[in-house]
Structures are given as structure tokens and as C-alpha cells.
Amino acid sequence: MKKIQSLLALLALLLPVCAAAQEAKELTADCAITSGKVRTASAHDNDYTTAWRSERVRRPYLEFQLPEGETAGWLYVCFAEMPQSWAVEEKIDGKWQVVADGSTDYIHALVELSGQNRFRIVENSGIATRLKLNEVFVFGEGDLPDWVQRWQPTAAKADLLVLATHPDDELIFFGGTIPTYAVEEQKNVVVAYMSYANAARRSELLNGLWHMGVRNYPVIGTFGDSYSTSMTEMYSRWGRQKARGYVMELIRKYRPEVVVTHDKGGEYGHGAHKVTSDACVYAVENAADASVFPALAEQYGTWTVQKLYLHMGEENVIHMDWDVPLASMGGKTSQQLAQEAFLLHVTQQKTSYVVTDEGRTGNANFSLVYTTVGPDIVGGDFFENVE
């Protein structure tokens, strides 16, 4: 019995060691990272706001040389601009050879390697261009840290579409919506944006969503980021048909049962938020009519949304409780997760915006402005009455 107890005690001591041995070591700081005569520090300074770019040439690259005896198991690339085509190459017998073709599906991309010591990222479209990166990270073999993103495709069919104008709007104005439904309730949630503002904020967007437990890649629109209090002016800048068509495509392509978007007054009067809200109402009301944007109807079919909620409002208002602990996220509340995610929007930390359910633009009140399943009676759940 004593021998068995001693063996069990020894195993208990060894288990943490085994677990630790499986964790991938970050090797970025150990690498010699080069790209011809171009300085590369901004590609690996842990600052998403200091984008790195190569020379403008055919096949621009960023090369990594690990110390002797060290090998790479993973390469995590955060692009500032998606290349037309790219790959990871290894030098074998004096020649660069492709070891992994890069995907253009995700702006933050993870590549599994197989013990390379010297390798490079290369843009291989054949045209003269620049390689533009926000950050790169190199890891050895093993289990990656939780913050490294390995995105899955956008859900083919949405239960819920969350439509925000800019990065961080989904946190400030919609509070715990995303972690509550995408993670705790395990709904198919499509998070979509009209604009990503700039490359740094797009990376912050992804970092924030990932922190909240989102694993399906968002839809990131390309409308320009500018300010006006006028909805008419913003429609002029974005194009009324283009903005409405973008939202209509989201609805017909992803077929959500419920849609959540901005206050019709633009939250604090922002014209771009007003356009998002107005275009969303238009698209929801007309998505079942094949004569409206007929090309999209032919491509995706028509669709009938069951419920549309706008942030705030004065009629048919429900209050969402974002302070309920989520078992799926270790007991943190969805509001806490949204607040933590907002901290990852580093460029916005000097603004006056906060993630809270208090105040005039608090993120807990929503108005039901369109429904095919009747009014909310109980409240507190976007999916009340949804079939």
C-alpha cells in the first residue's frame, strides 16, 4: 500500500511537469528577423499600432532565423493588409520551397510548422507590392497560449446577427450580447461591422472578440471611417444603395432569426451609426421581397427575420441583465468580458467611452422595432417567442 501511495504521490508531482512540457514556448525574441535592408522591429514589438511594411518589390518577405537547436512549431501572423497571395517557405538545399500555403480568409492567421529553423513569410502573387504586418509571433511545438487566435469560418446560418458600425461599438453599445449568446447560449452568432476604421483597430476588433470566447470569424465591412452628425451626409459618403445592399446581403446570406443593431439616433448622434440603423431597418423590412436587390435574392434567396432590436429606444423596450455569471467563461459576467475586451482596443483608451449599463447610452436597454412573432412579454431575452 505504501508503495502505491508513493507512486501516486510521484505521479502527482510529475503531472504538472508533463503539462508544462506540452506548452509551446514563444521564440519570437530569439529569432533574427530580417527583410533585406528594411528594419523589422515594428513587426514584433507587441504593438498593433506600429505596422511594419516591406520594400515594394516582387515577392516581398519577412525572414526568421532561429538559434541553432531551436525549431518552430507555429507562426502566428497578424496582417495589416491582406496579401493577394502568400506562403511560408523554408530554405532547403539552398532553395526556398513552400512548406505552407497561406489562407486569405483571416487577417490574423495561424500556420502550423514542422520544426523549421529558418523560414520566411513571402507574398507570392508575382506583382510588385508590399508585405504589411501588424505583428508576428513564433512558437515552438506544443499547446499554444489561449490568446493565439485560430479562427473558424463565419457561421453559415445565423441565429443572431449583431451589426456594429465600428470596432468597439459591439462592446460599448451592445454590452454582453456577444458572450451571452455566442458562448454561454451556444447560438450561431454572426458579428458584422460596417467599417474597421484602420488596420490597428481591425486587429483590436479580433483580439476583443477572441477574448470574449468568439471563435467564428466576423464579417468586416470596408466602408470608410469618418464623422458627421448627418445621416444624409454619411449616406452620401458611403452610398445609400451600397450601404443598404451590404446589410441586405448579410441578412439574406446568413439568414438570422434575430438582428441587433444601433439606436436610430446614432447613439450619441453619429451619422454612421444612424446609417447602420436605418439601412438595417430597411433590409429587415424588405429582405423577403425578391424585387428589392433582386441580384441578392437570386444569389441567396429571400429571408424573413423574426425580430429586430435597436439599442435604446422608447417603445417596446426590454432590459438585458449582463451581470449574470457565465458558467462557460469561469463565472465572469458578460459585462465583465465586454469590459475586458474593450481594454484590448488600446487605441480607444484615451476616449471618454466606457462599457456600462448605466447612463444615457447604457448598453442594457433595447427596443423591439420589428417582429413576426409578437411582442415580448417576459423580456430579458432576444429570443423570446423565436421559433
Features from the language model and the residues they span:
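A general structural signal for short secondary-structure junctions and capping/turn motifs
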Residues: 2, 210, 250, 297-302
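Disordered, acidic Ser/Thr/Pro-rich linker "stalks" and the adjacent N-terminal cap
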Residues: 22-72, 78-86, 90-97, 101, ...
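Active-site beta-strand->loop->alpha-helix modules in alpha/beta enzyme cores, enriched
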Residues: 81-84, 92-293
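The feature marks non-catalytic terminal segments
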Residues: 23-24, 28-51, 152, 181, ...
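Sec/Tat signal peptide C-region and signal peptidase I cleavage site
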Residues: 17-21
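Bacterial N-terminal signal peptides that target proteins for export
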Residues: 1-8
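Bacterial N-terminal signal peptides
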Residues: 9-16
